[in-house]
Swiss-Prot record:
Residues engaged in binding Mg(2+): E71
Organism field: Euplotoides octocarinatus (Freshwater ciliate)
Name assigned to this protein: Tubulin alpha chain
Modified how: Acetylation of alpha chains at Lys-40 stabilizes microtubules and affects affinity and processivity of microtubule motors. This modification has a role in multiple cellular functions, ranging from cell motility, cell cycle progression or cell differentiation to intracellular trafficking and signaling.
SUPFAM superfamilies, sorted: Tubulin C-terminal domain-like, Tubulin nucleotide-binding domain-like
Predominant location: cytoplasm
Residue numbers of N6-acetyllysine PTMs: K40
Annotated compartments: Cytoplasm, Cytoskeleton
MF-aspect GO terms: GTP binding; hydrolase activity; metal ion binding; structural constituent of cytoskeleton
Highest taxon, organism lineage: Eukaryota
One Gene Ontology term from the biological process aspect of the record: microtubule-based process
């Protein structure tokens, strides 16, 4: 079996996690108490969904996941929510003190008290796997826990499980919408360790997802629940091939192989189509070509950046539902002829496609329409550098005056770590710039890129 362990860190990570497990349970027909009437092999079996769920002897399906937070309220919502019987109480780990939007608290003072307990629980889950293939992390980097404890945990996982791949879904601060003044600090410090300790990071940002909800689903004032349900659909599409049997299945490590040209260039853009409300879906026939085109629309991107300003290096299309390879090939061929969608000249093929025959599932009472087919795209584009340069600019404005820095230093950080992280990100922006430059014929690859 190729199991995957999910790790949800901080409030953002846990709430996205809730939406995901809610959806996974619906997709597999698992009830809130963990029973699965359709599962014929009680207490074990080698079904595809066992990558995400382990089974007890009594036929209960338990997610291979841990939820970590430095304060109890969000974990308590899981403990008392609809799916309270689904999770093992040991999988919900909460501290008593908040990280207070402070990376240093999450990473040094308070995080380090809880991190060994977390690793211990993760070790228990890992021992329960026959062939662990990697970890999927869920966190936001604007706050203190997701950024601080998130990076601490990723660093420790690199040490304990060196070769296992780590994929993260990282919620980045948005250009306009802000939840904390010190977001730029936390994000820069956190990205510094994401650079080293994750293999693929999928960038999401609330503002981009808000706009999609507002525009495509006609929700006037989207709530976090609306956002998380949409994000859950994306994550579900990416992991569908791990959880169901399909024609062209894609493994977690395959994402890495196909999307990451250089180790540092591993921040991905994602998009999902069709995002459409039930009223509209009734009137529209969404063909494979149409959903493929709309997944390349700048407006469909789940992070605020314009892919037309950059070049694609690689692109992974995960189709699900009523889709045949012939249609996919035709749709991709059309995309390649479009002038607006540019690939770097050293990546001529650039597409990896997966098809999964399980149609998308919708949450009852949710916003999305039930459709026959959907596509999720993850792409590596040089345009994502916009996200970094935006954060770096905000970081510089604050750091020039050393504003708020004493809160971090007071928790045992050194000021040097700020400039180190900032320089690392400056180098990353430079890397993205170089990757997009046309290579001159005959001189081959640039040296100096690692």
């Amino acid at each position: 079996m190729r199991e995957v362990i999910s790790i949800h860190i901080g409030q953002g990570g846990i709430q996205v996690g809730n939406a995901c497990w809610d959806l996974f349970c619906l997709e597999h027909g698992i009830q809130p108490d963990g029973q699965m009437p359709s599962d014929k092999t009680i207490g074990g079996g080698d079904d595809a969904f066992n990558t995400f769920f382990s089974e007890t002897g009594a036929g209960k399906h338990v997610p291979r996941a841990v939820f970590l937070d430095l304060e109890p309220t969000v974990c308590d919502e899981v403990r008392t929510g609809t799916y309270r019987q689904l999770f093992h109480p040991e999988q919900l780990i909460s501290g008593k003190e908040d990280a207070a939007n402070n990376f240093a608290r999450g990473h040094y003072t308070i995080g380090k008290e809880i991190v060994d307990l977390c690793l211990d629980r993760i070790r228990k889950l890992a021992d329960n796997c026959t062939g662990l293939q990697g970890f999927i992390g869920f966190h936001s980097v604007g706050g203190g826990t997701g950024s601080g404890l998130g990076s601490l945990l990723l660093e420790r996982l690199s040490v304990d499980y060196g070769k296992k791949s780590k994929l993260t879904f990282t919620i980045y601060p948005s250009p306009q919408v802000s939840t904390a003044v010190v977001e730029p600090y936390n994000s820069v410090l956190s990205t510094h360790s994401l650079l080293e300790h994750t293999d693929v990071a999928v960038m999401l940002d609330n503002e981009a997802v808000y706009d999609i909800c507002r525009r495509n689903l006609d929700i006037e004032r989207p709530t976090y629940t609306n956002l998380n349900r949409l994000i859950a659909q994306v994550i579900s599409s990416l992991t569908a091939s791990l959880r169901f049997d399909g024609a062209l299945n894609v493994d977690v490590t395959e994402f890495q192989t196909n999307l990451v040209p250089y180790p540092r260039i591993h921040f991905m853009l994602s998009s999902y189509a069709p995002v459409i409300s039930a009223e509209k879906a009734y009137h529209e026939q969404l063909s494979v070509a149409e959903i493929t085109n709309s997944s390349f629309e700048p407006a469909s991107m789940m992070a605020k950046c314009d892919p037309r300003h950059g070049k694609y290096m690689a692109c992974c299309m995960m189709y699900r539902g009523d889709v045949v390879p012939k249609d996919v090939n035709a749709a991709v061929a059309t995309i390649k002829t479009k002038r607006t969608i540019q690939f770097v000249d050293w990546s001529p093929t650039g597409f990896k496609c997966g098809i999964n025959y399980q149609p998308p599932t919708v949450v009852p009472g949710g916003d999305l329409a039930k459709v026959m087919r959907a596509v999720c795209m993850i792409s590596n584009s040089t345009a994502i550098a916009e996200v970094f340069s935006r954060i770096d600019h905000k970081f510089d404005l604050m750091y020039a005056k050393r504003a708020f820095v004493h809160w971090y230093v007071g928790e045992g950080m050194e000021e040097g770590e700020f400039s180190e992280a900032r320089e690392d990100l400056a180098a990353l922006e430079k890397d993205y710039e170089e990757v997009g430059i046309e290579t001159a014929e005959g001189e081959g690859e640039e040296e100096g890129m690692e």
